Amino acid sequence: MPSIYLNIIMAFSIAMVGVLVYRSHMMSSLLCLEGMMLSLFILSTLMILSMHFTMAMMMPIILMVFAACEAAVGLALLVMVSNTYGLDHVQNLNLLQC
């Protein structure tokens, strides 16, 4: 396995640890989730290109579309929560209440 794959897997792992460590702030969690999605995009693109698997060439593009939608929804929730409560602490919120 080339070292580029190990570096990307390590970047994904560090971003996942970041989600677990910085889960009290919504903005930090969103940034770590974006790092995870970016490393998945790069890893899937490299795997598809190295294996010459032409049937799955659309998968990284679809992954980026879902990442963009996730970022838009996350930022909209961040704006709504910060306007309503004045903070972005996830632990102080109960989003199940109306």
Swiss-Prot record:
UniProt GO BP? ATP synthesis coupled electron transport
Which segment of the chain is annotated as a signal peptide? none
Compartment list: Mitochondrion inner membrane
UniProt xrefs under InterPro entries: NADH_UbQ_OxRdtase_chain4L/K, NUOK/Mnh_C1-like
Could you list the residue ranges that cross the membrane?
A: 1-21, 29-49, 61-81
Q: What is catalyzed by this enzyme?
A: a ubiquinone + NADH + 5 H(+)(in) = a ubiquinol + NAD(+) + 4 H(+)(out)
**According to Swiss-Prot or TrEMBL, what is its membrane topology?**
Multi-pass membrane protein
Q: Which family does it belong to?
A: Belongs to the complex I subunit 4L family.
Report what the protein is called.
NADH-ubiquinone oxidoreductase chain 4L
Source species, please? Dasypus novemcinctus
